[in-house]
UniProtKB/Swiss-Prot annotation:
Subcellular location: Lipid droplet; Microsome membrane
Protein name: Peroxygenase
Broadest EC class assigned to this enzyme: oxidoreductase
Co-factor binding details: Binds 1 heme b (iron(II)-protoporphyrin IX) group.
Pfam families: Caleosin (PF05042)
């Protein structure tokens, strides 16, 4: 049987381990939390993943990207990324710059060959090659979802509410995850979490845990798109009645 010291998650000489705590009993709340999940994004509230979300035999990282693959051919072009941004509710300016940044920086690592493409396509089957540093490590290097790392986002950073993150807590999250000499990773992480905050914050200015989890498997994007369509249909119906 392991000694108490061998199971300690804090060290007195390393105050950061006390400030940013982990859940020592996570395996009581979620089966095999350190096992990377290839197909579903699970947490303590959703041990089977997102209800109704179809994984299509894709990795969780691939599912995240596949939302923007509007014609389902396995390749995401800049104009598809733009349409994906628009589908979830971002304005034209954010959508335009978002598609440029994402496709310019992520295209080349996913290409099947060495010659760059002027169309900046992102190949979904190779998206794991485009994983940047200074991230939360919720995706492993093959694009699987690591539940323990996802839970750490909240145990380490959610100081106001255990299942929500404020803007300042999201900022601190990106600061805590910084790797040395990785400016591109620092910027990418902040942009990603800023976009999530803009998209999913509640009326009190917090990002719920469920929204954060939904980003990783793309189910949040699907929810936002469906919600916008319902809202647009309702407005259109009311307009006709008037």
């Amino acid at each position: 049987m392991a000694s108490n010291e061998s199971l300690q998650t804090t060290a007195a000489m390393a105050p950061v381990t006390i400030e940013r705590r982990v859940n020592p009993n996570l395996d009581d709340e979620l089966p095999k939390p350190f096992l990377p999940r290839a197909l579903v994004a699970v947490d303590t509230e959703h041990p089977s993943g997102t209800p109704g979300h179809q994984h299509g035999d894709m990795s969780v990282l691939q599912q995240h990207v596949a939302f923007s693959n509007r014609n389902n051919d396995g390749i995401v072009y800049p104009w598809e990324t733009f349409l994906g941004f628009r589908a979830v509710g971002f304005n034209i300016i954010i959508s335009f710059f978002g598609c440029l940044i994402i496709n310019i920086f992520l295209s080349y690592p996913t290409l099947p060959g060495w010659i760059p493409s002027p169309f900046f396509p992102i190949y979904i089957d190779r998206i794991h090659r485009a994983k940047h540093g200074s991230d939360s490590e919720v995706y492993d290097t093959e694009g699987r979802f690591v539940p323990a790392k996802f839970e750490e986002i909240f145990t380490k950073n959610a100081k106001t509410h255990p299942d929500k993150l404020s803007f300042s807590e999201l900022w601190n999250l990106t600061e805590h995850n910084r790797n040395a000499l990785d400016p591109l990773g620092w910027i990418a992480a902040k942009l990603e979490w800023f976009l999530l905050y803009s998209l999913a914050k509640d009326p009190h200015g917090f990002v719920p845990k469920e929204a954060a989890r939904g980003v990783f498997d793309g189910s949040l994007f699907e929810f936002c798109e469906k919600s916008r369509k319902v809202k647009q249909a309702t407005v259109k119906s009311l307009t006709f009645k008037i």
